[in-house]
Swiss-Prot record:
HAMAP family linked: RibA (MF_00179), RibB (MF_00180), RibBA (MF_01283)
Residues flagged as site, Essential for DHBP synthase activity: 124, 162
CDD domains given in the database record: GTP_cyclohydro2
Gene name of the encoded protein: ribBA
Keywords, comma-separated and alphabetical: GTP-binding, Hydrolase, Lyase, Magnesium, Manganese, Metal-binding, Multifunctional enzyme, Nucleotide-binding, Riboflavin biosynthesis, Zinc
Lineage: Bacteria, Bacillati, Bacillota, Bacilli, Bacillales
Cofactor(s) the protein needs: Mg(2+); Mn(2+); Zn(2+)
Protein name: Riboflavin biosynthesis protein RibBA
Keyword Ribonucleoprotein: no
Active site (catalytic residues): 327, 329
Record note on cofactor: Binds 2 divalent metal cations per subunit. Magnesium or manganese. Binds 1 zinc ion per subunit.
Pathway noted in the entry: Cofactor biosynthesis; riboflavin biosynthesis; 2-hydroxy-3-oxobutyl phosphate from D-ribulose 5-phosphate: step 1/1; Cofactor biosynthesis; riboflavin biosynthesis; 5-amino-6-(D-ribitylamino)uracil from GTP: step 1/4
Any one Gene Ontology BP term: riboflavin biosynthetic process
Amino acid sequence: MFHRIEEALEDLKQGKVIIVCDDKNRENEGDFLALAEYITPETINFMITHGRGLVCVPLPEHYAKRLQLEPMVSQNTDSHHTAFTVSIDHISTTTGISAHERATTVRELLNPSSKGSDFNRPGHIFPLIAKDGGVLRRAGHTEAAVDLAKLCGTEPVGVICEIIKEDGTMARVPDLIQVAKQFDIKMITIEDLIAYRRHHETFVTKEVEITLPTEFGTFHAIGYTNSLDQKEHIALIKGDVSTDEPVLVRVHSECLTGDVFGSCRCDCGPQLHAALTQIEREGRGVLLYMRQEGRGIGLLNKLRAYKLQEEGLDTVEANEKLGFPADLRDYGIGAQILKDLGLQKLRLLTNNPRKIAGLQGYELEIVERVPLQMPTKQENKTYLQTKVTKLGHLLNL
């Protein structure tokens, strides 16, 4: 049904059109997408004939500034905040509406010598300003077009057109599948593009290294930042972990209430202390402390979830009541830090199969799962039972 991002990139590099939709939900809509660098009148004509939507040109903000493309409106009230600029035609065109003249306008947007005065306003091409960070910041077709152009190594500008059915209604995923088959077009999702970028790009930066004496032992501490959400993480390292021998690793998500205040609602604090103790005892290992409070929902939302648990919900139901998944954590940043430290083979201290799968997806080999089970307390018995029954944690209760 859907194609791999690599397949779509190959077609785009050949000047072909692809279809991009938000995700695999059958109610989502789709756009035709092509690279502006390879645009032709034939491609424009295909889009307006079979797509029937508005032909838009997603581009980075610095292109818009260079060409003096001001926002279409001073106050954007669009529900998706699509960043339309004023519409344009190149001054060499006549009416600007034909496929040939629209292709000319697109090509002239890429001309490095073009300036704002080279375009008439309004016109028949609709530039869109993509957010910096692309689909990792805004999961829209605008950002997808610019990201795909960058991944293809061309000018970071795309051409998109919404796909509308012959009866005038929006084409949904089942309709898009038929269109893709009819014209032998690759179809991808923005969801998969996000995953592709997370997997293939590096977002972590090593910022500072210190020696950190603790009550558990002395560790080499390295602080990291990441460009996705600007959160700061820290790795505590014991011994030489750059060899080929498997390394004992604990990826620990921040829990202020458990780690610092000793909350009995969870087993986070005891797990943290036990992991540091075990790493110190073995003389070699890594504890990666990730700022993912409350399984990724943040401190205040975790407290709100606790409040709902006091009213009878379990930890998963509380998250869902607040509008969050049961577990919002993404292990990609943690995996990149571990790879930056030179790790390849891990003996992972965890009870969570999802954590194993999350790290293995980033080419880290988990050679052994090392259980990290703490004594059950009356206050956290229900919490731990829910982790077993609903989150699949491997605990003997």
